[in-house]
Each structure stands twice: as structure tokens, then as C-alpha cells.
Design a protein with these regions (language model features):
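Flavin (primarily FAD) cofactor-binding/catalytic cores of flavoenzymes
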Residues: 1-56, 60-257
Length: 257
């Protein structure tokens, strides 16, 4: 399985439910498994001051809040839940340089804390690792070549040493493609190629106005084209979950009517 996030967890659960008892190899650049949801008392801190901080200050504050919560037997997950409603504002109030630092150094660690899985599924992943039925590899896939009934994977590990695996099948669990220029959807390629649209901040998704209207290559807003969901990640960051999608869909419907 290529990728170690939520899609990987779903894939492993599906394989186990279908009776697969062989070894599962999971490969990703950071080899980080999603962390579990937790039950317990909610954290009672005010996250609003985070909005005035830079990236380094925010990360330090969150670690301190999580540590303080732990002294009262409050799970760190509740701290993350407190900042959940501020997701888009937290992204938009970072400087461009801090956003770039986040994408380069923080995002993988953020994702496993922010996008979590059910505790029983997390326990299942740990048990599979413990019994060596799930092996986690930190590396970057380079080639995948079919050889008879098998697929031979060639990768580069964290120390840039070659890593080879021979498997029966490969599952792409890398999730949503965020890089605009790497998107293979013909419509999106045409929008970008013709200048009707342009890549969003940091080359992620499509550039949009605050109301979701598409922005073209010249910076002109096109209100007749409304953008929703993962294509707005560059502008909003939090743009995948149901609450955000519901709000964007309502705004698009209002614009259309």
C-alpha cells in the first residue's frame, strides 16, 4: 500500500475483513500512522490567541496545552478539537513564508494528529505490526514493474538506500492530489492550460476568491465558476470535511440562484 494515511487504514481494514491473512507492506515518505480518536473530558482553553502567533509560536503553544491537559487526564485529542472551528482562519493568518514552512516541515505530523481514525482500527494496525503482518517502510517509490503474477517495487529509503519489494498487488492510498500541475483531470488541465483558472497558493488546488469564485490567470474573478472541496485547499487548507463542504455547497447554490 502506497501511503500511510486514512486511505491506507481503510484499505487494511477492507483486506482484513475480506479474509486476507498475508503480510501487508505500507510505504510512505514519513511512515506515520494515523493516530486514534479518544474519549474523555474536553479541553477548556481559548484557541483564539493562536491567530496572532506565527507558526513556531503556535506549535509551541499547542504542545504546551496538550501537556497541561495530560496532567488533568484530558487527552491531547481534545486540544485539537478545540482548534477545529478555527482551521481556515489559522491557515489564512499565517504568513506566506510560514505556510511554506508548514508544508515543508509540519504538515505530515499535523495530518496524523488532525485526521484521526477510530481507536479499534488503530489498535488493529498496531496488532498487525506487532505480529509482523504489517510492515511500515519509510521511503519514496521509484518504479513498479509487473513480473508475471507479482509486482516488483523499487524505492529509496530514508537514507537514500535502495529498497526492493515483491508483492502481489499495489494499492494507491496517497489520497487527494493537491498539486495543481499534477492533476490529471482533463477539465482541470484545460482550465489551467487555457488560463481560465490558475493554481492556488503554493501551487495547491485552484486559486479562488473568498466566496469560492474561480480566479483566472490574470487575477480576474469569474463568479460564474464556483470551486468547492479539495480544490480550495491552497486558499483555505481545511476544505475536505463535511462542515466545510456543506458551507461551500450552500454558498455556491446561493450564488447560482
Amino acid at each position: 500500500i502506497i501511503g500511510s494515511g486514512l486511505s491506507m487504514a481503510d484499505s487494511v481494514a477492507t483486506l482484513q475483513a475480506s479474509g486476507h491473512r498475508g503480510r501487508i507492506h505500507v510505504m510512505s515518505r514519513h511512515a506515520l500512522l494515523p493516530l486514534p480518536h479518544a474519549k474523555g473530558a474536553g479541553a477548556d482553553y481559548d484557541p483564539e490567541p493562536l491567530l496572532a502567533m506565527n507558526l513556531r509560536q503556535r506549535m509551541h503553544a499547542l504542545r504546551c496545552h496538550a501537556a497541561e491537559a495530560a496532567t488533568r487526564d484530558i487527552p491531547w485529542q481534545s486540544v485539537m478539537e478545540r482548534i477545529r472551528p478555527l482551521g481556515q482562519r489559522l491557515w489564512q493568518t499565517l504568513s506566506f513564508d510560514d505556510q511554506r514552512r508548514f508544508l515543508r516541515h509540519v504538515v505530515r505530523y499535523w495530518d496524523v494528529h488532525r485526521h484521526r481514525i477510530a481507536a479499534p482500527l488503530h489498535a488493529q494496525l498496531l496488532e498487525l505490526q506487532k505480529t509482523d503482518r504489517l510492515q511500515l517502510h519509510r521511503g519514496r517509490l521509484e518504479t513498479a514493474v509487473a513480473e508475471g503474477a507479482c509486482v516488483r517495487l523499487t524505492a529509496q529509503d530514508r537514507w537514500r538506500q535502495p529498497l526492493q519489494l515483491e508483492v502481489q498487488c499495489v494499492v494507491n492510498a496517497t489520497g487527494v492530489e493537491m498539486r495543481a500541475q499534477a492533476m490529471r483531470n482533463p477539465l482541470l488541465q484545460q482550465l489551467l492550460g487555457s488560463g481560465v483558472g490558475r493554481a492556488g497558493p503554493h501551487g495547491i488546488g485552484l486559486d479562488t476568491a473568498p466566496d469560492g469564485s474561480l480566479i483566472d490567470a490574470d487575477g480576474v474573478v469569474e463568479p460564474r465558476v464556483q470551486v468547492l472541496g479539495s480544490l480550495r485547499i491552497g486558499s483555505l487548507w481545511e476544505s475536505l470535511a463535511i462542515p466545510e463542504l456543506r458551507g461551500q455547497a450552500a454558498a455556491a447554490a446561493k450564488q447560482a440562484l
